[in-house]
């Protein structure tokens, strides 16, 4: 685990974004942990989050021309990542996002920001069912651009109804990498090393054994 990944897990726990307990997911599963990126909800938290995303971008080695943030949650994530790449990695890259509903007046259209062209890196928080990413892939295709990959905050490493996770299905169906700041494996590693949080390790390991990929 890289230092920035360990720092990100600590940051997520401190912000209440990553919590441990008993949570019912949309899938109906009872999970021993929950990740809510909406709680990165202050200026300083968003700035710090952007730096973690930027570190993961650099670490991934994915070559791309523009960042894309899917509405709505991906919009601040893509903008924060673009700022952090410019300020901390000397990479001043364009970024773009979509509107949920196309605008008929003013500049019009459903895209805001830089033109969506070339190789596109999609920035989002998590991939649960993969539905939102499939919609984004169509937007990119409609602009004659190419998806270069997807970057998310947490890979739950959890299968859906079949044998694959939603992330693996996206990788298979579109032939692109999906990378994350951290994965559940790294969260487990963090728990094992933390005396205060170690109590949650057995429940998370049991969940991973039952639903993991």
Curated annotation (Swiss-Prot):
Its EC number is 2.4.2.10. Orotate binds at residues 34-35, 128, 156. 5-phospho-alpha-D-ribose 1-diphosphate binds at residues 26, 72-73, 99-100, 103, 105, 124-132. Its cofactor is Mg(2+). InterPro entries: OPRT, Or_phspho_trans_dom, PRibTrfase_dom, PRTase-like. The keyword Transferase applies. Pfam families: Pribosyltran. Keywords: Glycosyltransferase, Magnesium, Pyrimidine biosynthesis, Transferase. It comes from the Bacteria. GO terms for cellular component: cytoplasm. One of its GO terms (biological process) is 'de novo' pyrimidine nucleobase biosynthetic process. GO terms for molecular function: magnesium ion binding; orotate phosphoribosyltransferase activity. It catalyses: orotidine 5'-phosphate + diphosphate = orotate + 5-phospho-alpha-D-ribose 1-diphosphate. Pathway: Pyrimidine metabolism; UMP biosynthesis via de novo pathway; UMP from orotate: step 1/2. Catalyzes the transfer of a ribosyl phosphate group from 5-phosphoribose 1-diphosphate to orotate, leading to the formation of orotidine monophosphate (OMP). Belongs to the purine/pyrimidine phosphoribosyltransferase family. PyrE subfamily. NCBIfam families: pyrE. Homodimer. PANTHER family: OROTATE PHOSPHORIBOSYLTRANSFERASE 1-RELATED. This is Orotate phosphoribosyltransferase. It comes from Pseudomonas syringae pv. tomato (strain ATCC BAA-871 / DC3000). The lineage of its organism: Bacteria, Pseudomonadati, Pseudomonadota, Gammaproteobacteria, Pseudomonadales. The gene is pyrE.
């Amino acid at each position: 685990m890289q230092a920035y990944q360990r720092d990100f897990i600590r940051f997520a726990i401190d912000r209440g974004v990553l919590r441990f307990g008993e949570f019912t997911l949309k899938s109906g599963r009872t999970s021993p942990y929950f990740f809510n990126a909406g709680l990165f909800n202050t200026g300083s938290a968003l700035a710090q989050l952007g730096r973690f995303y930027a570190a993961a971008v650099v670490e991934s080695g994915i070559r791309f021309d523009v960042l894309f943030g899917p509405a709505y949650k991906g919009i601040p994530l893509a903008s924060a990542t673009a700022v952090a790449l410019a300020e901390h990695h000397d990479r001043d890259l364009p970024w773009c996002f979509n509107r949920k509903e196309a605008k008929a007046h003013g500049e019009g259209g459903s895209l805001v920001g830089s033109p969506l062209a070339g190789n596109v890196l999609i920035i989002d928080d998590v991939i649960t069912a993969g539905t939102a990413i499939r919609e984004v892939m169509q937007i990119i295709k409609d602009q004659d651009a190419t998806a270069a990959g997807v970057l998310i905050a947490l890979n739950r490493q959890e299968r859906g109804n079949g044998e694959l996770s939603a992330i693996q299905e996206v990788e298979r169906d579109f032939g692109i990498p999906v990378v994350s700041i951290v994965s559940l494996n790294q969260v487990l590693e963090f728990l094992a090393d933390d005396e205060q949080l170690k109590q949650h390790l057995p429940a998370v390991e049991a969940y991973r054994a039952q639903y993991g990929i």
